[in-house]
Structures are given as C-alpha cells and as structure tokens.
Amino acid sequence: MKVLVVVQARTGSTRLPGKVLLPVAGAPLLVRMLERVRAASTPTEVVVATTTDAGDQPVRDLARQAGVRCFSGHPTDLLDRHYQAALACGLSPAPASGGGDGDEGDGDVVVKIPSDCPLIDPAVIDRVIGCYLAAPERYDFVSNLHPATYPDGNDVEAMPMAVLAAAWREATRPHEREHTTPFIWDQPERFRLGNVPWETGRDLSMSHRFTVDYPEDYAFVSAVFDALWTGDGTAPSGGFGLNEILDLLAARPDIFELNRRYAGVNWYRNHLGELATVGADQTRRPEEAR
C-alpha cells in the first residue's frame, strides 16, 4: 500500500495572486506548508500538484528545492490533476481486492491537502490518515470536513485510489471537477464515509480561520508564524501546533481579529443549490462575514 499526499498549488489565485510564494518566517508559504505536511509521523510520499501554466514554474522550482516531487496538470480540473498526479507517482487505480465501490480493501491511498493551509497541524494529518488506515476495509473516504469541527485550514481528505478513479471517470458537474472530491462525499448512499471530529469536542470551523485566501488571511498567518515559529531547525513543524495557536489567539486577540471577518467563508457558498449534504449553516458569503 502506498500513501500519497497531494498538495495542490498554483500562483493564479484571483483573490491573492501568488499567495503560495509569499514570504512566511523567511521562506515561501508553500515551503512552510510542506514542512508541516512532512512533519506528520505517518509514512507518506508527498507530491505538489500544480498546473501546466508557464506562470507556475516558480511552484515547480520551489518543490524541487524542497526535495518534493512535482506534477503539472490541468489548470482548472482539479479532479483530473489529483488523479493524474497519483498515477504519475505509481499509484494503482485498481481495487486491491478486485471489487468495486465498497470493496477497496488495502489498495493505494490518496490524501488531499490544499496548499493554502500553512498552519495545518501535523497531528491532525496523522489522525485523519490513521482513521482510514486503521480499517481501510470500512471506508471509501475519510476526512475531517463532513461535518467540519477543526479551525478552517486543517483540511485532510483520505481515500483509496480506486475511489478517486471512480470519481475521475464518472464526475461531470463543474464543481465536482473543480473541487476534486464532492462526487464522493456528496453521495453517502453510495460511498462509505468516515469523519474525524476534533477530539476536544469543540467546533471552531466557522469562527477560526487558518487558511489563506485574502490579504487579511496572509497577515494573520504571518503574525502567527512571527510569534510562534522557532526557526532553530529542531522541530520540522516550526515548533507549534493547533494548541499553541489557540493559546496565542487567546492571549493576542489583535491577531485573531486580523481575518475574523472572513471566518466561515468557503467555496460551498457558490454551490448550495447543487450540494446535497451541505447546508447554508456551513458557509458564509464575504459580505455577510463580520
């Protein structure tokens, strides 16, 4: 069994162009993100999945400098990009046991983590992947997003390569291609879904925002790194995780306020009429955020 973490990254963000290249604690945001992904204890291979656009050459260069494999694929069809990246890394789309949906066994595993989550806690990555690996015969998809409870920006989705292949073959609606996995998690009657809630019992998914889409998000992430990053090379994750971030925000409400107005803003808002398992209480529009 291979476990492949696919980190999607590009420079063409409309709200914050080139965000993965912006400096965070003396290195590009993507580098800090990859450090935290690789700090997870679960043995995985990591690949950066960028686009074929010439403007994404800096992403390819950064991945190479970081010692991480890079795949260049479709600019807007993220489902195809993830699938092709996994194929390029040697994963097999065939179910391990030769079955179909619901019988993927211990085949190769794809883990989806977006590159705009530079504060992701390596322990959260381990929890989600560990949930799947503990009983791969039970699940077609495991994430910590359905429903979400962790602060936004700790997104981890794990699935057998065979299930990703089924989505790649069958998904036709634009949002299913753009966002990679809705074809899977929006069909609980077909796919066996697992969710990993925050073990604290808290739900900060709509109140705390650790992802980067807007300039205010970048200011927030920069402030967190400036306050907590050790920079001494002894801790691959920078020496801090989710608990340390929350302690910092409790002590420094000025940092928390930097991007609070965008808490709860996500892509669901544009597809509420198309998503069967997502409600209006799981998203906000930017103009509604305060």
Each predicted region: which residue ranges?
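Conserved nucleotide-sugar donor-binding
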Residues: V156-W168, P215-A219
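Short aromatic/hydrophobic "clamp" motif used to bind/position activated sugar donors
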Residues: V110
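Acidic metal-phosphate-binding loop of nucleotide-sugar-dependent transferases
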Residues: P75-T76, C117-L119
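Conserved N-terminal catalytic core of the sugar/cofactor nucleotidyltransferase
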Residues: V31-G98, G105-G107
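N-terminal glycine-rich phosphate-binding loop and ensuing alpha1 helix
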Residues: K2-T50
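Conserved donor-nucleotide/metal-binding helix-loop-beta segment in metal-dependent transferases, i.e.
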Residues: Q84, C89-L91, D121-T149
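Conserved alpha/beta core of the MobA/IspD/sugar-nucleotide pyrophosphorylase nucleotidyltransferase superfamily
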Residues: T181-R290
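Active-site acidic Asp-centered loop
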Residues: I113-S115
